[in-house]
Every structure is written in C-alpha cells, then in structure tokens.
C-alpha cells in the first residue's frame, strides 16, 4: 500500500472489509482507516473487536469523504453493479489517490485446469468474473488508468486446493496443480490465479 500510494500514512477505505483484520493492520502502521461491508454482523464484529468505523454500502454511497487509498480485496466480483462502485470510488479519492483491486483471474492456469470446477468462480456469490482485458476496459470507462498489476502467488495454491477438494480430488493433486499455476505465473503474470490492480 505504501509503495503503491507513495504514502506512509493517510486515510484508507476498505470496501468489503469482512472481519477487519486488514483495517486493523493498517491502523497499527499509522493509517486512518474506515471500512464498508454489506453484512451488519461483520460491521458489528469489526466495531466490537477493533473499535473501527465500518459503514453500510448505502451510508458510504451517500457520503462525501475523501481518501488517499481505497482497497477492494476480492470484493468487486460480489457487487451487482461494480461500475457504479468504481464511479463512486473515483469521486472519493483525493487527487493523487490510489485504488487497489484484487480479483480472481479466470484466464489463469488453474482456472483452465479445473474448468467449471474452479473454486474462484464461486457461483452464485461471485457475480462477475474478470480478465486483465475486461478489467482495463471497465477501469477506463470509469475514469481510471491501471498503473500496474501484481500477482497474488499464494492464491494459485489456495484456489487449486479448494478446487481439488470440491471435485473430490486429493489434497496432493491440488498442491501440484497450484505449483504448476504458480510456476506458469512466474513467466506470465496473467496466468496467476488472482491479480492486484493498482489504479489512479
């Protein structure tokens, strides 16, 4: 986050913050943090556990607060109209603000290996699925430019192991396919199971 934003501290918003561990970690490094989550249970958990401010999507959409960094860690694919959120995020970013989006990549080696059994399809919870090309198009249509892309190397193993389990395959086969996916991503990052997009 610090490398991507060029800031050691600032104001950060995490959309789809879940249990709040990322927010708490960033708070400990000196960031002012806020979360958004659709789950009232999650909002209460984060508030009670970490004493952090977490808004509902409706409350956030109606606010006008500005942030130096907005993060979406595997949350954009759960949103019915992700372009609406991206448009709103753009209005919430400071002039030099950064958007960080992590998404499953269905062009990955493990996605091709497992086909419809690929765990990261996660239907019906995942409403949209992205490639680097489709992400570039939606980002551009919402006024963003992708500055860089980064691999989430562990996801090659994690998603492969989950996929193997869902398909009744062995744990070892999941690890092996995860290794193959990880190795292929070493030579071509667009083969990685999940990618992080840094946008401005």
Spans of model-derived segments:
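N-terminal start-of-chain detector that recognizes signal peptides
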Residues: 25-27, 100-101, 119, 167-173
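Short glycine/proline- and charge-enriched loop/turn segments
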Residues: 114-123, 162-169
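Short hydrophobic/aromatic-enriched beta-strand-loop microsegments
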Residues: 54, 120-121, 149
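Conserved SAM-binding loop
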Residues: 1-114, 127-144, 154, 194-200
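A C-terminal cap/extension of S-adenosyl-L-methionine-dependent methyltransferases
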Residues: 147-200
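A generic fold-level signal
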Residues: 7, 122, 190-192
């Amino acid at each position: 986050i610090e490398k991507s934003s060029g800031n050691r501290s600032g104001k950060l918003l995490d959309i789809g913050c879940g249990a709040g561990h990322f927010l708490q970690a960033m708070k400990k490094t000196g960031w002012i943090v806020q979360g958004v989550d659709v789950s009232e249970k999650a909002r209460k958990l984060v508030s009670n556990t970490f004493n952090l401010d977490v808004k509902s999507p409706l409350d956030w959409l109606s606010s006008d607060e500005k942030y130096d960094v907005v993060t979406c860690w595997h949350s954009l694919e759960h949103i019915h109209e992700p372009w609406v959120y991206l448009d709103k995020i753009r209005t919430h970013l400071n002039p030099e603000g950064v958007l960080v989006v992590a998404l499953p990549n269905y062009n990955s080696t493990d996605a091709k290996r497992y086909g419809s059994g690929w765990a990261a399809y996660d239907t019906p919870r995942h409403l949209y699925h992205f490639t680097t090309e489709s992400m570039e198009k939606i980002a551009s249509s919402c006024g963003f430019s992708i500055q860089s892309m980064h691999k989430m190397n562990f996801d090659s193993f994690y998603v492969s192991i989950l996929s193997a389990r869902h398909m009744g395959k062995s744990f070892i086969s999941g690890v092996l396919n995860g290794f193959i996916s990880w190795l292929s991503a070493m030579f071509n990052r667009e083969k990685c199971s999940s990618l992080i997009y840094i946008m401005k």
